[in-house]
Amino acid sequence: MLKFYDREFSSRLLIGTALYPSPKIMQDAIRAAGSQIVTVSLRRETAGGRTGDAFWSLIRELDVTVLPNTAGCKSVREAVTTAKLARELFGTSWIKLEVIADNDTLQPDVIGLVEAAAVLIKDGFKVFPYCTEDLGVAMRLVEVGCKVVMPWAAPIGSAKGIVNRDALRLLRERLPDITLVVDAGIGAPSHAAQACELGYDAVLLNTAVAKAADPVAMAGAFSLAVEAGRTAFEAGLMEARDFASPSTPVVGTPFWHAVS
């Protein structure tokens, strides 16, 4: 089972709610993914008016856990304020914390992120921080009280998949008791499977499903990929080798194949 703070879930695929061709397709895709947790932007919900009400109605029909985020925030103050508004609106202490340093790369402001996380945790929030794959940053987030860390695979929406595999592997090795979620940069089901094969507890994605030619079918594909990757990790993957190693035993080889 996947554990986030004091709650357990069976699905290891978290999915976003933006960019879909229609609300109905979004709803069908989330169902196909089997996701139990969806991320929602506070800015979309508060700016939507009646459209926001209809969107929220669709989310309630799915019977999923909502993880609001602070997407678009560029300062500690803005992120903390947005998180507090999200707690009031959605009735949850969970927050996906994003503090963005640059609009072009959407790279996290890791200094502001740690500061904001510390403030929110003291205020009773359960923080899900979006960060880079830097081990030092992840350790600081854990030190201030984060039980979940969400490093990117690649920049948001880039669809590049895992760019720094060694760094993500190191995070998993050094933070064995922390729930780790690969967040951002996933473009194909194979990328999600690779993340789970590394031992990551879950994958969070949005654009790869929402912008697919068939979002519903793609959501199903990601669900299968995450399950396959996790099963492979638990089964124990063989280590890569630099040289060939015969898979067929030589014992019992017919004598005429023997080399004199």
Curated annotation (Swiss-Prot):
Its EC number is 2.8.1.10. It holds the Pfam family ThiG. Keywords: Cytoplasm, Schiff base, Thiamine biosynthesis, Transferase. It is found in: Cytoplasm. GO terms for biological process: thiamine diphosphate biosynthetic process. Belongs to the ThiG family. This is Thiazole synthase. The lineage of its organism: Bacteria, Pseudomonadati, Pseudomonadota, Alphaproteobacteria, Hyphomicrobiales. The gene is thiG.
